[in-house]
């Protein structure tokens, strides 16, 4: 298990480092939207989380459970994703009109599924500290996934603002599912599903920022 975790976390670190560096080069310029920069910062947090995992595996040979810098990085990443979608987009998109009520209710499916996934952690064989830390992480993933799904199905506004970032929101939603899946598979020690999940996470990490950039280039505002 050590070799697999070591190899996969190293590969994921480099994938996330490439994505983060690309985002910094493309979006951290004068006149670029804060929304884009916050998403890049979220990817940076994930990169730091994987760096911590690699260092921990090299020095101790195991992944530490409970609260640590790696877990804090995951929390930070989804907090950035949440703030980007809620603070920078949702307040402009949803004015609270009654006709849009169903687009506020349907996205609850995402956090409910994340919560159900967390039950496998809650009732799994792990420490109480790890259950609490995973619970806090899952809560942030739940909130972030709600807005990802909401912006995936919400009717477009004029200028194609929401339509052009739907692909990004789909990828971010997949990342949320993969992140809760990683918690589950690590506790259950399911090696093959974990490797498949890590490969998918590499693909998602590499494509997220370029897909976002391609979408925002179509904004006409």
List the predicted regions and their residue ranges.
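Internal transmembrane alpha-helix with an interfacial aromatic "cap," most often the third helix
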Residues: 19-29, 54-65, 69-104, 115-122, ...
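C-terminal transmembrane-bundle signature of multipass membrane proteins
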Residues: 78-86, 142-221
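Membrane-helix boundary elements
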Residues: 1, 109-133, 187
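Hydrophobic alpha-helical transmembrane segments of multi-pass membrane proteins
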Residues: 9-23, 34-59, 71-81, 110-117, ...
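Non-cytosolic membrane-interface motifs at loop->transmembrane helix junctions
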Residues: 62-73, 126-137, 190-200
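Intrinsic-disorder/low-complexity, polar/charged segments
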Residues: 33, 58-64, 127, 158-159
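Membrane-interfacial loop-to-transmembrane alpha-helix junctions, especially the N-terminal start
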Residues: 30-45, 96-107, 158-171, 220-221
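Hydrophobic transmembrane alpha-helical segments in integral membrane proteins
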Residues: 1-19, 71, 119, 129-138
């Amino acid at each position: 298990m050590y070799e697999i975790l070591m190899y996969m976390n190293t590969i994921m670190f480099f994938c996330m480092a490439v994505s983060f560096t690309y985002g910094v080069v493309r979006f951290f310029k004068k006149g670029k939207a804060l929304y884009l920069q916050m998403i890049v910062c979220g990817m940076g947090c994930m990169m730091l989380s994987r760096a911590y995992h690699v260092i921990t595996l090299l020095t101790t040979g195991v992944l530490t459970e409970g609260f640590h810098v790696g877990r804090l990085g995951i929390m930070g990443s989804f907090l950035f994703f949440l703030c980007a979608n809620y603070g920078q987009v949702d307040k402009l998109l949803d004015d609270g009109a009654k006709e849009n009520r169903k687009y506020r209710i349907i996205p609850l499916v995402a956090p409910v599924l994340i919560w159900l996934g967390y039950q496998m952690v809650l009732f799994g064989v792990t420490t109480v500290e790890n259950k609490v830390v995973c619970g806090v992480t899952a809560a942030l993933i739940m909130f972030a996934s709600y807005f990802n799904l909401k912006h995936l199905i919400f009717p477009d506004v004029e200028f194609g603002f929401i339509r052009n970032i739907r692909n990004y929101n789909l990828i971010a939603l997949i990342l949320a599912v993969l992140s809760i899946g990683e918690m589950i598979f690590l506790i259950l020690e399911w090696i093959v599903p974990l490797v498949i999940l890590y490969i998918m996470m590499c693909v998602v990490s590499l494509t997220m920022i370029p897909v976002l950039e391609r979408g925002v280039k179509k904004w006409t505002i």
